[in-house]
Amino acid sequence: MAREFSLEKTRNIGIMAHIDAGKTTTTERILFYTGRIHKIGETHEGASQMDWMEQEQERGITITSAATTAQWKGYRVNIIDTPGHVDFTVEVERSLRVLDGAVAVLDAQSGVEPQTETVWRQATTYGVPRIVFVNKMDKIGADFLYSVGTLRDRLQANAHAIQLPIGAEDNFEGIIDLVENVAYFYEDDLGTRSDAKEIPEEYKEQAEELRNSLIEAVCELDEELMDKYLEGEEITIDELKAGIRKGTLNVEFYPVLVGSAFKNKGVQLVLDAVLDYLPAPTDVAAIKGTRPDTNEEIERHSSDEEPFSALAFKVMTDPYVGKLTFFRVYSGTLDSGSYVKNSTKGKRERVGRILQMHANSREEISTVYAGDIAAAVGLKDTTTGDTLCDEKDLVILESMEFPEPVIDVAIEPKSKADQDKMGIALAKLAEEDPTFRTQTNPETGQTIISGMGELHLDIIVDRMKREFKVEANVGAPQVAYRETFRTGAKVEGKFVRQSGGRGQFGHVWIEFEPNEEGAGFEFENAIVGGVVPREYIPAVQAGLEDALENGVLAGFPLIDIKAKLFDGSYHDVDSNEMAFKVAASMALKNAVSKCNPVLLEPIMKVEVVIPEEYMGDIMGDITSRRGRVEGMEARGNAQVVRAMVPLAEMFGYATALRSNTQGRGTFTMHMDHYEEVPKSVAEEIIKKNKGE
């Protein structure tokens, strides 16, 4: 099968935005106008084409980026719908990695919102060219020029309007195209017919003013145009378009469009702008990779002639075809039924079938070409971020980096039948999502799941129930405390049972001392003259090790202590290993009153990134969580606060930070060291654990 669309006529785009800016509705309309959907689905009725997981329809938010193929004016447009919620930023990063360009959707009433900042920063990191669509122009309080202003003020983006709305709120009737210098009025409800007319008299002056500032901004990025402009020559429409395209592709300029996806106005013009201003795979720099054997850097150009290379950016379990691996082809071609090498894992994989996805239906294709996005069926070992390549010409494309999970919750199956299913379900979910981890706590035997936030874990538990039919109880998050001794002492442990017949006799003297942090348990045998026979020494050590596991204060493991066995006595008949084991554990219990045992807690290294104006609130909040601020620095237009905070105080922090900063703050944390718990807090924990 020959290539249907040339590389120059291919666009891989993402649609990114804050929650509820109208991203899914915009995607819907794009699919409607490109002829892939017959009936328009409304998100607020829970019937959208792109949001196809049940919980997405219920919550009205988009979680998985469904990759969809559409056609417009002889071009192929691959669209990746991305989530706009903080807990799902990994999905966004994942999509941005494989896109060539993006449409940022703003709400005309609010302009740039908190999550827009986060997603915008991520897009800048990956160097993704963007056009901006100011949506919801029909909403009360909609203000187009205010929204354009927020792009400049809050994101320092060189953004300029290339359109102007005619009217606003209920009177939003049409759109003025500042590049072509015409006005579009919509004739029917579905917005399929719009006629280009002359700009209405009352808008002429404003339109001319905005068009002139647009031309100036474009000329500043292009010397030839600047010279022409300064000499007073007219800039033609084609030159203006070429200038906007050049600035956009260099990520130096952001054209801003306007409309209302819900009212079917302006979406076709967004599609035209995608073709006019966003890059084809050939406009993007060649992707860099390394040879697995020599680590030498190599490039793969976007061409069918080059060896095959692709990046897997999403793994999903589909109820009908099993495991689907979404991938972006960077170079070469791939036929279904052929073999490829997963160079990241060093495994050979067979591509059973190749599907091109349309929101929730699929079409089987025989070949994918450079620049395409498709899903493969039949890959066994491939996970998110892996490179797939030609077996004869290996390359590892730079992978994606995923943040560490920040929240842990204990989970247990409701019944025995759920137990086995739960293990399988968790393993499959962890395979799909690199920011979700699962482990079994060896001390409590609980299954612990970890993720990026409370909503993230809620949805995981919800998916277990719906997709895998597993019912589970979710506990409150737990902290792994430890215990240790602060002072040393010599203690006796004596176990004697002699009441006729064979008795029990074990007697030891042990000196306990605190050990260095992280050094663990050390046992020393200092018996002289056989007062405790050699064969009983290992029993003394084993008795201590068992007793340490259960602690002395609140049942948490006792760590970092030294024990020296220096004296004791035995009985010819009644002594045995068991008796010495018990004697050793009694010695440890007797040490409680003399060795000043304390409780230790994990201390997390926390880094919070926030806009300057929230600095005071955040510092106060960290202090109230028993945290110590270690340092601060400016990073771009944000502030970074570094602090040490006990894990026990960090539960619910993601939610608190979100509300303290209107969602504009982000944080990362990882375990740093153990530290003594303050007395008042320790007493509470001990009481709770002893069930008092």
UniProtKB/Swiss-Prot annotation:
GO biological process: ribosome disassembly
Primary location: cytoplasm
Keywords from the named record: Cytoplasm, Elongation factor, GTP-binding, Nucleotide-binding, Phosphoprotein, Protein biosynthesis
Phosphoserine: residues bearing it: S213, S302, S569, S680
Modifications the protein undergoes after translation, according to the UniProt entry: Phosphorylated on threonine residue(s). Phosphorylated by PrkC and dephosphorylated by PrpC, in vitro.
Pfam family for this entry, one: EFG_III
Entry GO MF terms: GTP binding; GTPase activity; translation elongation factor activity
Domain tr-type G: 8-282
Sequence positions that bind GTP: 17-24, 81-85, 135-138
GO CC entries: cytoplasm
Superkingdom in the source lineage: Bacteria
Compartments reported by the entry: Cytoplasm
Family: Belongs to the TRAFAC class translation factor GTPase superfamily. Classic translation factor GTPase family. EF-G/EF-2 subfamily.
Protein purpose: Catalyzes the GTP-dependent ribosomal translocation step during translation elongation. During this step, the ribosome changes from the pre-translocational (PRE) to the post-translocational (POST) state as the newly formed A-site-bound peptidyl-tRNA and P-site-bound deacylated tRNA move to the P and E sites, respectively. Catalyzes the coordinated movement of the two tRNA molecules, the mRNA and conformational changes in the ribosome.
Name of the protein: Elongation factor G
Name of the gene this protein is made from: fusA
